[in-house]
């Protein structure tokens, strides 16, 4: 089966490589041509446009930064996709957006599968992300081999729109955990504890989290380099708070966390790494959160 892949950012490039290594034919495009340079040696075909990818592949996967870009790319690829093709959307969208996009695709005879992912760039590199899927059962079955080339767990959440809800929930939790980890580490530092030892103690405790193990380590290194921007965090928190209003659920922690990210964007810019919210505390208290022995970037070996 031949898949097209559009969007070769922090996640997409790894996903395309893993699909090719699993034996799929893969054609790719990114608005930044240099993003595809490293993929050529893997036998991946680089196309000159998104529409060329659609004309070449049996099915098209997109992994893009926001719904506006997803819609623009979708409008470009649909006229060149086969009527029996599937569009697999791995970007994080709101539920209403993905339902609307699915309807637009259906007008061209193209079916939609949403498959946002969670786990982080270091897991994408080794094909161990968690795939959160929404769509028809037969489409999930058809594309499970490709999905399992990119991840090691698939959760079929229900119809189109359901995966968007759970993806936003998981990201909301991650951002809340990141704020909590930043505050916990600062408490440890100001309390006179060795930060490295404190990190390990938290990791072994009931207060541990995936975010503490991963992004907490990058805070202690000082790189903050998780490959996920403050702008993307604010986008996803906006989706979460929108769901809260729609479903009548007060989201006090998410609201407070959003304000922290707003402050971090004002201080460091929207392209800054999301763990840089810890810098707000560091600068406020004139106290850094550095400790020896923590990685600059996450890999499967260094995470946790």
Predicted regions located by residue number:
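NAD(P)+-binding Rossmann beta1-loop-alpha1 motif at the extreme N-terminus of oxidoreductases
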Residues: 1-62, 84-85
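Rossmann-fold NAD(P) dinucleotide-binding segment
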Residues: 50-111
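Rossmann-fold dinucleotide-binding core
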Residues: 8, 93-171, 175
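Residues in the short beta-alpha loop(s) of Rossmann-like NAD(P)-binding domains
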Residues: 31-32, 66, 136
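Helical "substrate-binding/catalytic lid" subdomain
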Residues: 142, 162-284
